[in-house]
A protein has these predicted regions:
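An anion/pyrophosphate-binding glycine-rich loop and adjacent beta-alpha core
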Residues: 1-3, 9-131
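A short, aromatic/hydrophobic, helix- or strand-capping loop or linear motif
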Residues: 5-7, 155-156
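A glycine-rich dinucleotide-binding beta-alpha-beta segment and adjacent secondary-structure elements
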Residues: 116-191
């Protein structure tokens, strides 16, 4: 038996700063899972912001792998860090008078989310691309390519839409659903 645990659960975030945009969601974003400094995996999907944390298919599907204290990092723009940094440098040279908020519209993020991320750096939305310092550019890259959320906890059984664990599938014949350990014992449903 694999110990049962909640699955398809929302994630509660420590020191959550996005409660003001509860109800806002982003589509098809990449989420990275870190435990300490080690990247354990990544998952792509839609993400919803709640009053206390993260939800939506991109989080729910990944929740079985997440533990308290883990860090989720969300890539809001789908560019790799080096690509985004290069794009910002090029834009500052060619479109230097453009405000950072205007430039970032091409990534089609909800305005409220965009403003919260800029505020977290902090950088004023009206700051022109040519005025952005190297330090601010690095902060922009970190914030938009791997925005960090420290997991306080994963929703428990009362919030989970499914359960992970139970009978080990390694001990079940997948064609007949008969136990490999106890002949004549068959499983049905969520095992």
């Amino acid at each position: 038996i694999v110990p049962p645990k909640p699955s398809l659960s929302p994630v509660f975030v420590r020191n959550y700063t996005m409660a003001s945009i509860a109800g806002v969601s982003v589509q098809d974003k990449l989420v990275y899972l870190y435990r300490g400094d080690k990247k354990l995996g990544e998952h792509r999907g839609d993400i919803g912001f709640t009053h206390k944390g993260l939800s939506g298919p991109g989080i729910l599907d990944f929740s079985r792998n997440i533990l308290s204290g883990d860090q989720l990092r969300i890539n809001f723009i789908d560019d790799k860090a080096d690509e985004f940094r290069s794009a910002l440098i090029t834009a500052s040279e060619k479109e230097g008078k453009t405000a950072i908020q205007t430039y970032l519209k091409k990534y089609e993020l909800p305005r409220s989310l965009l403003q919260l991320i800029l505020k977290s750096i902090p950088i004023e939305p009206e700051t022109r691309l040519a005025e952005i310092t190297k330090i601010q550019r690095n902060q922009l890259v970190a914030a938009f390519c791997e925005y960090p959320f420290v997991v306080e906890k994963v929703g428990g059984f009362n919030m989970a839409m499914a359960t992970a664990g139970g009978v080990s599938l390694a001990e079940v014949n997948s064609k007949t659903m008969e136990s490999k350990l106890v002949p004549g014992l068959y499983f049905a449903g969520e095992v």
